[in-house]
A protein has these predicted regions:
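Small-residue-rich segments of transmembrane alpha-helices in multi-pass membrane proteins
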Residues: 17-22, 50, 76-86, 149-161, ...
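Loop-to-helix transition at the N-terminal end of transmembrane alpha-helices
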Residues: 35-53
Length: 229
C-alpha cells in the first residue's frame, strides 16, 4: 500500500501542472463548453488513478520478470535467445499504448499512408529485431557504437527512397516505442542478460537496448515506405 501511495503522489504532482495550465487557459483564453471542461477534469482524475495503478503494477511484476527472463535466456542456448528476444520485443510493442495511439492518429489523418495494423506490425517487427541485436550485443560484448552508427547511416540512406510522409512517420515511430511498457521491461531484460556474465559493466552493457529499440522501428517503417512506393 505504501508503494502505491508513493506512485500516486508522484503521478499526481506530474499531472497537476498540466491540469492547472488547462484550467488557466479555460479561465482566460479558451472558454471551451463547460461540459467539455468537466470531461477534461474527469479524464485528468482517471489518468492519475490509472497511471498510478499501472506504474505500481510495472514495478511489482513487470520489472522483476523482465530481469529474471534476461538472466535465464542466455543459459538456454543461442536459438532461444534469438527466438524469445524477438518474440518479447514484438509482443511488448504490440501492447504499447503509445504505439497504438500513434498508429491510430496516422490512420485518422486520412492520408491513406498505411493502416493502423500495418504500422503496428512494422514497428513491432523493428523492435523485435532490435531486441535480438541488443541481447546479442550483451552476450558477445559488442560496442553499442558499432551497432548504432551503421543503423543511422541506413536510416538516412533509406530516407532518399521514401516519401516525406513516410520519412516523418518513421522518425516519430522511433519515439513512440519508448513508452511506459516497453522501456522498463526492456531495461530490466537487458540488465538481466548482463548480470549473467561476470566482470561486465552493467552501465555500458546493460543500457543501450532502448536506443536500439528506437532505431529499429525507424528502419522498419522506412522499409515499409520503400515497399509502398
Amino acid at each position: 500500500l505504501d508503494q502505491f501511495k508513493q506512485e500516486f503522489r508522484e503521478v499526481f504532482f506530474s499531472i497537476l501542472p498540466v491540469t492547472l495550465v488547462i484550467v488557466l487557459l479555460q479561465v482566460t483564453l479558451i472558454h471551451m463548453p463547460f461540459s467539455d471542461f468537466l470531461q477534461f477534469l474527469l479524464a485528468a482524475l482517471l489518468t492519475i488513478v490509472g497511471l498510478s495503478l499501472f506504474l505500481f503494477g510495472v514495478k511489482l511484476g513487470l520489472l522483476p520478470i523482465g530481469e529474471s527472463l534476461g538472466s535465464s535466456l542466455p543459459h538456454k542456448g543461442f536459438f532461444w535467445v534469438i527466438f524469445f528476444g524477438f518474440l518479447l520485443g514484438f509482443v511488448i510493442t504490440v501492447a504499447e499504448p503509445d504505439v497504438r495511439i500513434f498508429a491510430q492518429q496516422i490512420e485518422d489523418a486520412g492520408e491513406r499512408i498505411a493502416t493502423q495494423n500495418v504500422l503496428i506490425l512494422a514497428i513491432s517487427l523493428g523492435v523485435g529485431i532490435s531486441v535480438v541485436m541488443a541481447m546479442l550485443r550483451s552476450i558477445f560484448n559488442i560496442s553499442l557504437t558499432l551497432l548504432l552508427i551503421p543503423s543511422y547511416i541506413l536510416v538516412f540512406v533509406l530516407g532518399y527512397f521514401v516519401s516525406d510522409d513516410f520519412f516523418s512517420i518513421a522518425l516519430d515511430a522511433g519515439g513512440v516505442t519508448t513508452g511506459p511498457i516497453t522501456v522498463p521491461f526492456l531495461m530490466a531484460l537487458s540488465i538481466g542478460v548482463v548480470s549473467v556474465f561476470g566482470g561486465r559493466d552493467k552501465v555500458s552493457q546493460g543500457f543501450g537496448m532502448v536506443a536500439l529499440a528506437s532505431v529499429g522501428p525507424v528502419i522498419a517503417v522506412m522499409v515499409l515506405g520503400v515497399l509502398f512506393s
